Amino acid sequence: MSTTAKLDPQVALAELRERKPDRVTIVVLSGSMDRVMSAFIIATGAASMGMQVTTFFTFWGLNVIRKPGLSSKARDWLRRAFGLLNRGGADTLPLSRFHFWGLGTRMMKLVMRRNRMPGVPELMDMAKDLGVRFIACTTTLGLMGITKDTLVEGIDQFAGVSTYLAEAKDAQVNLFI
């Protein structure tokens, strides 16, 4: 008998039905435009391949899902200062390098436009359209004085690290950006 015997199609179909879909989790820690773009490019790529993708926004990554502006509704002055010093909005993120007081970011956006590459807000919309889940870290929200009403629409869940870890333990790919 040949070692390359053909697999019965019914068995193969049953195995496919039992197989869990591939899963990806991405911790978005950075609030830098280039790093956030990388996170969303990976997320949309994985989702377009049929993978289940969960993004977990924490610390500076929360600025990505904040509404634009300098609003803070924290009660104590220290957390209010964090909120006010931290500009929110996916379109206002600085570059991780060569920021040059905003000039580098503007130059990067110009090059992206000329090459018809989507920016962070468009990548976020694409991710949502592809079913990527957005989780906002509640611990960090409280720590940084960011309230739920200052976040954009479409956050799927407000949760802590235990929720992320439950997602990550079943995922085949876990990234920290």
Enumerate the language-model features and the residues they cover:
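Short, glycine-rich nucleotide/cofactor-binding loops
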Residues: 26-36, 65, 111-115
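Anion (oxyanion) recognition and catalysis
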Residues: 47, 128, 169
